[in-house]
Amino acid sequence: MARYWPEPAHTHGTPERTGILLVNLGTPAAPTAAAVRPYLKEFLSDPRVVEIPRAIWWPILNGVILNLRPKKSAEKYAAIWSDAGSPLKVHTERQAKLLAGYLGHAGVTSVVVDWAMRYGAPSISDILGRMKAEGCSRILVVPLYPQYAASTTASVIDEVAGCLTRWRNLPEIRYVRNFHDHPGYVGALARSVRDHWAKHGEPDQLVMSFHGIPKRSLDLGDPYHCECHVTARLLAAKLDLPPERWQLTFQSRFGKAEWLKPYTQPTLEALGRKGTGRVDVICPGFASDCLETLEEIALECRTAFLGAGGKAFHYIPCLNERHDWIAALTDIVRSRIGDWLEAPVPAAELLAATAQRARTAGAER
């Protein structure tokens, strides 16, 4: 096998373009055990996600988890699947299209905006290859994780770097590391909450539920826990909420190890037992609604809270395609590629002259 993938044919006199690659976690191709199994295998084989020695983890993964979990996970996906497909995939694709439109409206036209999934399809490798074929010599990678974590953002960066080891002609690469405290992002979160409250009234308690990670990751220096707290504090301040009316929790614990606390579902059950009238839950760590928000929070946690004695439960959707969120995303992107945009685009006459010189020198294209 060749060490490097073949380079696409180059046409002299073609202007350089900038690629914007949005990346989210991923999704199976269908809500079936057969489709979930390879997706879970790819996800749980990532050493950034599971930091257990391979000799110990492989028998557990292949002998136990991949034989038991796909069917259960498929049932959960089926509960939130739409006619358009996986909600995460649908929202991410729409966000990419909207971002391209917002950039174009702002006069940024020499860009290619696309999207990929860290696990599943479309893969990072395939979309990077497509960007190269479209003439992108500069690429900004935007992991759609507001808070940085080694298991999410760093995994995306690992995958991009791994793909580029197979390229001969490398592009200039930049990454968005996080945007947990970006004013536009926090402002969009606050407005989404206020919009919900304007229609349904305010709750007794607002719970901000973030995806959890093992506590060991925090102990080893992962900044995720701190960035979640920053986001929660800024959001509470935007909403003018006193400390007794909101709290931060962590969801989606996997395995038996201790994860970041407090855990979301036990917290909601405790609120229910206390007779809390109404709880609203928002998930500020997710840019799009997905399995963890629509099934785990909106269905499972709702049942847990009401079953424990709570009176009313509201799930506040993720930002998805909200105008203020796409505007914030546009600002995040423009702030990272500003100097790229300042580079003058050669006039058509200059490009034609470049192409002619290349052909005179013997180039075929």
From Swiss-Prot:
GO cellular component: cytoplasm
Involved pathway(s): Porphyrin-containing compound metabolism; protoheme biosynthesis; protoheme from protoporphyrin-IX: step 1/1
Superkingdom of origin: Bacteria
Pfam family, one: Ferrochelatase
Matching Gene3D superfamilies: 3.40.50.1400
One Gene Ontology MF term: ferrochelatase activity
Keyword Lyase: yes
Keywords: Cytoplasm, Heme biosynthesis, Iron, Lyase, Metal-binding, Porphyrin biosynthesis
Entry EC no(s): 4.98.1.1
Compartments, as annotated in UniProt: Cytoplasm
A Gene Ontology BP annotation from the UniProt entry: heme biosynthetic process
Catalytically driven reaction(s): heme b + 2 H(+) = protoporphyrin IX + Fe(2+)
Main localization (coarse): cytoplasm
Binding site for Fe cation: 211, 292
Family stated for the protein in its record: Belongs to the ferrochelatase family.
Known role: Catalyzes the ferrous insertion into protoporphyrin IX.
Entry-linked NCBIfam families: hemH
Protein's name according to its UniProt entry: Ferrochelatase
Native organism: Aromatoleum aromaticum (strain DSM 19018 / LMG 30748 / EbN1) (Azoarcus sp. (strain EbN1))
Lineage: Bacteria, Pseudomonadati, Pseudomonadota, Betaproteobacteria, Rhodocyclales
